[in-house]
């Protein structure tokens, strides 16, 4: 997995060399996150909090509400970690707090694992020549990472392994040290610091490690799309590619090659490799039933893909919406219909005629009717009415069901379950 990094300082996106010299500053964190999220999780690092020179928590909260973020930087107690989880972070990165002056801070890590779960904890092994550094990489501990791996494994769902002396330098990472860590532990490892070529991306991925990228992306050494392709395992040939729509309904099974993925990322149209014709083909090129690329994920073995698209028309050559049957009616389906009617604004469209005042009145009315409904049929009928008007309200405010469901999922993952 490729994990792009958004490092924050004073509300801006920055890139530092060895955690010190700032060489890049941008003011578009939300736009970057939208772009990065198409490929999976994002690492969001609060540089100011790590150095105890401020914090960027409000901005991080915004990012966590919309995207799958692993959050780190200055998390020094259980309460801070739990707060980020409650705000929507999928994982927490802890570094400084995981160590004392002479070893592992087991009381803290034990309490953290009990509070948020071991699977959500990423322990940062920030090191200079094999020795752990803390406090924004400013403090040397003298602790050899090799000596504490087994002790840390009890509390970690993953390690973030950063070669600090190479961080931001674009001189290549320490592959020997990565190999040593990989030989010592079987839990997931994310490698960061100095990655400077697609060849290196391929080598690290083949070591069964994730890769966190920063400077190489921001300096345009290579693109996120290129690094995603480089991390895949093509040793068995073409990659099976499951294609689904935004609601999660499977549309078709296709196959991808390096070249088809390159073309797809460039055109943002569903593009695949035909095993029968032995060439690259673009979905909808002749029929007009095109697929707009939205996001992509690789599986755990890096040899299969799950791609989400916006489907125009139908996906199957039989004129069925999906190669696996007709379209399923889901909340996203209803919202798509509502948005179309709002955009078209036909004179005879009841949906388009609903102004804010009328819409508010109908929601209040239908909510009351749902409360008063008695039979099963009445409850279903009134719930459907309320759901429809709620969908119109969300659509007018340009809020997707995806964001609503993310909020419900966030609440479900916190300790205060309802």
Residue ranges and their predicted role:
Residues 103-115, 182, 201-229:
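C-terminal helical cap(s) of enzyme catalytic domains, especially alpha/beta-barrels
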Residues 2-8, 42-45, 69-73, 92-94, ...:
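Hydrophobic faces of well-ordered beta-strands that scaffold small-molecule active sites
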Residues 138, 145-146, 190, 212, ...:
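Flexible "arm" and connector segments at domain edges
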Residues 41-58, 96-101, 161-171:
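Glycine-rich, proline-tolerant flexible connector loops at the mouths of alpha/beta enzymes
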Residues 19-37:
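Short catalytic helix/loop segments, enriched in acidic residues and glycine
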Residues 58-60, 65-92, 176-211:
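Catalytic cores of alpha/beta
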Residues 33-45, 87, 153-155, 159:
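Catalytic domains of carbohydrate-active enzymes, especially glycoside hydrolases
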Residues 8-22, 85, 89-167:
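Conserved anion-binding
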